[in-house]
Amino acid sequence: MPLRMSTLFLRTLRDDPAEAEVASHRLLVRAGYIRRAAPGIYSWLPLGLKVLAKVERIVREEMDAIGAQEVHFPALLPREPYEATGRWDEYGDGLFRLQDRRGNDYLLAPTHEEMFTLLVKDLYSSYKDLPAYLYQIQTKYRDEARPRAGLLRGREFIMKDSYSFTVDDAGLDAAYEAHRAAYLRIFDRLGLEVVPVRATSGAMGGSRSEEFLHPTEVGEDTFVESDGGYRANVEAVTTVAPAPLDEAAMAALPAAEVKDTPVSTTIAALVDVANQLAPREGEPWTAADTLKCVVVTAVVDGGERRPFVVGVPGDREVDLKRLEASVGSALGVVGEPTLEAATAADLAEHPALVKGYIGPAAVDAVEGTPVLGADDSVSGLPFFVDPRIAPGTAWITGANADQRHVFGLVAGRDFTWDGVLEATAVREGDEAPDGSGPLHTRRGMEMGHIFQLGRKYAEALDLKVLDVHGKQVVVTMGSYGIGITRAVAAIAERYHDDKGLAWPRAVAPADVHVVVATKGEDGLAAAETLAASLEAEGLTVLVDDRPKVSPGVKFKDAELIGVPTTVVIGRGLADGELELKDRATGEARPVPVDGAVAAVLAEVRDGR
């Protein structure tokens, strides 16, 4: 049976929703695919569910093709498995937590690693049972602080998550490559360009990790690529550090010297003063010769504020997002803390920090020479440095005293640090870590993420099997996710114009949109006959048979809804002609009534 717009639960809108930030959000609401229930939470209407089902079908077909089997877990999960893996705390405020009437703790699932692991533990005990690839398509919940952009950043969303269970690393590598290839096929069928890039693992843990990013200016992620093939999310880019000097070479460098540097609280002012006070022969001082020490505050679960200092070259900016990926473990806190610039109140608790003149070593105010003890750090706060601050590099940096700086302070000789972190923003033109050329930055939207989890969850939940020698071994796991609802939004973002959506045929809510643009029974009868013939050929049909709606409104709705092929039954019907229109190109041409089915089938087979 065709979908008839006279009875379809649908209301198109002429005005954009007030909260819409991106085209996909605006058009999916206006065209009647989704409706907002609350911030970050959406209801799916009949047309939206048809698109969603087609995306899910493609994902299922490709997962089944690699031997994965579908299961389905509850969304309401007990606390205990997540406590065993540490993620009850790691997720922090991102979890939706609740209690039953007896006071037992539960969560709404953000992911299901623990449940998959326990299921396999309950049922499998031998290497003969493995490998096993399991997947589900299910609703997830994350308490996003700032849900935005409609389906792109929500609190409730649908994901395909799959997990591989193998006896060893070789099996994990095979599972990873099988999923990687399946993902590329999925996105190709969805009509989405994706770029696989190196990524961090975040709260998921594990080793090898790749994101599949769809290049788009509305994407929240920045990634880089080189002409030589290096590709990575900026959070995963490793800095090319200078070669360190040995102790003898460092000892031979000139001693550090404290100088008065009036009115030099900015890097630019400091460089000007340095070139006046201590001009360097042959090459003037630049911002790259300075070491700026930035105070950052980590806000951990529960709101505790943990200030620390990070030293970076003066010509570089601190990237809080890159820092977040690694600073949690460096500070000894669980999970990824939220980072923000230190406030005046944070600085007030550490009076040794003189704003504008902070450096890695304290200053002896009487003698005027730097105190360069090997264990000194800034005011007792943890002190981390960017990889460019390598042993033997010399810097102009703050002396922790008003209008004073230290010249020639040598890293590793005159000061040490508590850790090396990727702290600075990646810039256009930076050298690729693998030497494959300069990096170019692009914006992208994360569509999928695959991880080699290794044995993290299996060890935490004691998932073991007997190997071929009868010895118990910890199972090796992989995790592979695709955002289903995000894929719908990404396709809408990619395939639209100023008139509305223009779905690729693989996911369109119908193959053909038949618009009855004449009055009387002849037009309706022709539409029913055409729809029946098209359905007999295996196509799905949406018929606009609304009796009290003008042709102009019907045409606008057809463009807004975005079915790939439109057949207009209009004035030409009296002469035995219909109009066939391609939504993507806007091209329209007349076709004879008795040749309409063949013409539509030709378009479908051509992939138009």
From Swiss-Prot:
Consists of three domains: the N-terminal catalytic domain, the editing domain and the C-terminal anticodon-binding domain. It is found in: Cytoplasm. One of its GO terms (cellular component) is cytosol. InterPro entries: aa-tRNA-synt_IIb, aa-tRNA-synth_II, aa-tRNA-synth_II/BPL/LPL, Anticodon-bd, Anticodon-bd_dom_sf, Pro-tRNA-ligase_IIa, Pro-tRNA-synth_IIa_bac-type, Pro-tRNA-Synthase_IIa_type1. It comes from Micrococcus luteus (strain ATCC 4698 / DSM 20030 / JCM 1464 / CCM 169 / CCUG 5858 / IAM 1056 / NBRC 3333 / NCIMB 9278 / NCTC 2665 / VKM Ac-2230). This is Proline--tRNA ligase. HAMAP family: Pro_tRNA_synth_type1. Keywords: Aminoacyl-tRNA synthetase, ATP-binding, Cytoplasm, Ligase, Nucleotide-binding, Protein biosynthesis. Belongs to the class-II aminoacyl-tRNA synthetase family. ProS type 1 subfamily. Homodimer. It catalyses: tRNA(Pro) + L-proline + ATP = L-prolyl-tRNA(Pro) + AMP + diphosphate. GO terms for biological process: prolyl-tRNA aminoacylation. Catalyzes the attachment of proline to tRNA(Pro) in a two-step reaction: proline is first activated by ATP to form Pro-AMP and then transferred to the acceptor end of tRNA(Pro). As ProRS can inadvertently accommodate and process non-cognate amino acids such as alanine and cysteine, to avoid such errors it has two additional distinct editing activities against alanine. One activity is designated as 'pretransfer' editing and involves the tRNA(Pro)-independent hydrolysis of activated Ala-AMP. It comes from the Bacteria. Its EC number is 6.1.1.15. The gene is proS. It is an enzyme of class 6 (ligase). SUPFAM superfamilies: Class II aaRS ABD-related, Class II aaRS and biotin synthetases, YbaK/ProRS associated domain. GO terms for molecular function: aminoacyl-tRNA deacylase activity; ATP binding; proline-tRNA ligase activity.
